[in-house]
């Protein structure tokens, strides 16, 4: 008798995705981040659901409803901080996941990669709208500044911004619709993640060497289920440590001041995970140019497969490309730091240089270096 796991229509899907899935025998801990992102998403949906039970999306009561969650709801404080810091963990995992894809050439699976880019944009949109909901100073002014960027679009810009706001400024209508979108988007992300997995399982996983591993596959369970549990425990440990010891470490103190349209905070800045893109936006003096650079800073990932000039897939055996990759990482950390600094003399120039270097590495230096490496190997 065949195992029900392999025959039942529902369990068959789970079996082929998580149990009997043939996986390369040499994938490292860098391949853990997919499952960690799944855990983050589930955690965010659950904590978000419980927060939504007590939150009110009205400008007069939003701020006090968040205070009520933290003060009066049973364990409300831990749910709120798990959700806020869970977003940070989500983005840490996302950046590492994308970095892994760049390093090991996983972008050669074009459908999986492109859906991943759509997922990245969707998660960023969700996080931005979530940051507006507590209706603190940084929520209000962050929403005002970022939505205002759309006014740079020629001809329709101003109408588009007012349409998104639902009025002539960020107000009650904006908060209500942002809450609605923030609630629905994680479910859309879940659906996209399933499609992401569907396309991945069409090709099978890449591996650190970048060499096809069809001749050497092992079942996903128990090998990688155990490995993923280790990653999950590490993630939960990091998150609970952050939540219980320094829950406001990654937040902005200005968001503990209720939103006031009449007083602008001295430094308007987004959450830390958007700072690199914010720095690129600010480094261009022209408004439309800045908005385009902001979008392209993420959208550039879509043309990475077209710029792959190396005869090898992975960077494992390409030391020159490795140097460039880590230079890119350092550059992104520099941009993140600059995004949190005021617009003053040394920071402006550093931000402009780091922005130029970011696009230079991805568009020019990496393809040229790959060609040089091919020639060095006489390929």
UniProtKB/Swiss-Prot annotation:
Binds 2 heme b groups non-covalently. Heme b b562 binds at residues 83, 182. Its cofactor is heme b. PROSITE patterns: CYTB_CTER, CYTB_NTER. It is found in: Mitochondrion inner membrane. One of its GO terms (cellular component) is mitochondrial inner membrane. GO terms for molecular function: metal ion binding; ubiquinol-cytochrome-c reductase activity. The cytochrome bc1 complex contains 11 subunits: 3 respiratory subunits (MT-CYB, CYC1 and UQCRFS1), 2 core proteins (UQCRC1 and UQCRC2) and 6 low-molecular weight proteins (UQCRH/QCR6, UQCRB/QCR7, UQCRQ/QCR8, UQCR10/QCR9, UQCR11/QCR10 and a cleavage product of UQCRFS1). This cytochrome bc1 complex then forms a dimer. Heme 1 (or BL or b562) is low-potential and absorbs at about 562 nm, and heme 2 (or BH or b566) is high-potential and absorbs at about 566 nm. Belongs to the cytochrome b family. This is Cytochrome b. It comes from Enhydra lutris.
């Amino acid at each position: 008798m065949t195992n029900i796991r392999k025959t039942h229509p529902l369990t068959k899907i789970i079996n082929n995705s998580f149990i009997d899935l043939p996986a390369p025998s040499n994938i490292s801990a860098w391949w853990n981040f997919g499952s960690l992102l799944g855990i983050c998403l589930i955690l965010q949906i659950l904590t978000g659901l419980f927060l939504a039970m007590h939150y009110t999306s009205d400008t007069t009561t939003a701020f006090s409803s968040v205070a009520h969650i933290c003060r009066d709801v049973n364990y409300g404080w831990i749910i709120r901080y798990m959700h806020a810091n869970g977003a940070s963990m989500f983005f840490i995992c996302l950046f590492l996941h994308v970095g892994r894809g760049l390093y090991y050439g996983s972008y050669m699976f074009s459908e999986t990669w492109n859906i991943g880019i759509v997922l990245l944009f969707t998660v960023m949109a969700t996080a931005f709208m979530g940051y507006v909901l507590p209706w603190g100073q940084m929520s209000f002014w962050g929403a005002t500044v970022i939505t205002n960027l759309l006014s740079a679009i020629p001809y329709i810009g101003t109408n588009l911004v007012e349409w998104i706001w639902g009025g002539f400024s960020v107000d009650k209508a904006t908060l209500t619709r942002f809450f609605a979108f923030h609630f629905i988007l994680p479910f859309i992300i879940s659906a996209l993640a399933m499609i992401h997995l569907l396309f991945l399982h069409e090709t099978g996983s890449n591996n650190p060497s970048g060499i096809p591993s069809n001749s050497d596959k092992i079942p996903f369970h128990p090998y990688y289920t155990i490995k993923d549990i280790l990653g999950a425990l590490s993630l939960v440990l990091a998150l609970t440590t952050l939540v219980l010891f320094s829950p406001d470490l990654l937040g902005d103190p200005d968001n503990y001041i209720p939103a006031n349209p009449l007083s602008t905070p001295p430094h308007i800045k987004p959450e830390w995970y958007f700072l690199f893109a914010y720095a690129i936006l600010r480094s261009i003096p022209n408004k439309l140019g800045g908005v385009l650079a902001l979008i392209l800073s993420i959208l550039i990932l879509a043309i990475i497969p077209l710029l792959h000039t190396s005869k090898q897939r992975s960077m494992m055996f390409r030391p020159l490309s490795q140097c460039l990759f880590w230079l890119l990482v350092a550059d992104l950390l520099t941009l993140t730091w600059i995004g949190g600094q005021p617009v003053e003399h040394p920071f402006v120039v550093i931000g402009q240089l780091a922005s130029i270097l970011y696009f230079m590495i991805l568009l020019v230096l990496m393809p040229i270096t790959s060609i040089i490496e091919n020639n060095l190997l006489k390929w």
